């Protein structure tokens, strides 16, 4: 079965930890959307909901790949999922960090003027937690992507193709022609 080696114990423990962080990101972002009092939810928080949802979806696609290794278990496809999650988590972390401008949550003047905190210390703390978990998620997916690239490279057949005929290491071996004395 192609791509089975990626499902070692370490990988599953790591992916389960990623799922826990993804769930926390989704829960925090959803709570912020639910608590929004006026003007609808800001797009940056909605994007964070999408980041958490997509990461959970790709976890389950990876898990299904265990049972369908030729379709969803391709190590390059899983590396692509990790890369996309990496980019989404980076984007979400940057967006939330820019939105909250990282001030102290006990500064009432800051809380009242910031559109995202809406005067609430609780929302400020939840936004800071969301920012932290998005950056932590980013780090996890960078590590996962690097590991997955090594797994994918080891699962890919190693053929070298050269423009000049057959040489050592250029492909499958060819039997030599029989000589007259061998007939």
Swiss-Prot record:
Protein's gene: fhn1
This protein's GO CC annotations: eisosome; Golgi membrane; growing cell tip; plasma membrane
Location of the region described as Disordered in the Swiss-Prot/TrEMBL record: 163-183
Bilayer-crossing regions: 9-29, 45-65, 76-96, 132-152
Entries under Pfam families matching the protein: MARVEL (PF01284)
Protein name: Non-classical export protein 2 homolog
UniProt topological domain (Extracellular) ranges: 30-44, 97-131
Any single GO BP term: eisosome assembly
Intracellular or extracellular location(s): Cytoplasm; Golgi apparatus membrane; Cell membrane
Family: Belongs to the NCE102 family.
Chief location bin: cytoplasm
The keyword Cytoplasm is annotated on this UniProt entry: yes
Ranges in the topological domain labelled Cytoplasmic: 1-8, 66-75, 153-183
Keyword Cell membrane appears in the UniProt entry: yes
Function: Involved in membrane organization and might act as a sensor of sphingolipids that regulates plasma membrane function. Involved in a novel pathway of export of proteins that lack a cleavable signal sequence.
Keywords: Cell membrane, Cytoplasm, Golgi apparatus, Membrane, Protein transport, Transmembrane, Transmembrane helix, Transport
Protein origin, superkingdom: Eukaryota
Organism of this sequence: Schizosaccharomyces pombe (strain 972 / ATCC 24843) (Fission yeast)
Topology of this chain in the membrane: Multi-pass membrane protein
């Amino acid at each position: 079965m192609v791509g089975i080696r990626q499902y070692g114990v370490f990988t599953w423990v790591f992916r389960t930890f990623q799922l826990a962080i993804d769930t926390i990101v989704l829960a925090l972002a959803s709570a912020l959307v639910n608590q929004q009092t006026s003007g609808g939810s800001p797009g940056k928080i909605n994007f964070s909901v999408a980041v958490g949802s997509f990461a959970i979806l790709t976890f389950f696609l990876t898990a299904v790949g265990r049972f369908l290794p030729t379709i969803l278990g391709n190590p390059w496809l899983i590396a692509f999922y990790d890369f996309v999650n990496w980019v989404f988590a980076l984007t979400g972390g940057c967006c939330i960090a820019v939105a909250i401008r990282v001030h102290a949550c006990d500064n009432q003047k800051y809380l009242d003027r910031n559109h995202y905190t809406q005067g609430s210390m609780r929302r400020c703390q939840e936004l800071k937690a969301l920012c932290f978990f998005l950056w932590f998620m980013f780090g996890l997916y960078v590590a996962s992507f690097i590991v997955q690239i090594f797994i994918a490279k080891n699962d890919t057949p190693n053929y070298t193709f050269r423009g000049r005929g057959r040489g050592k290491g250029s492909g499958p071996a060819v039997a030599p022609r029989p000589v007259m004395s061998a007939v």
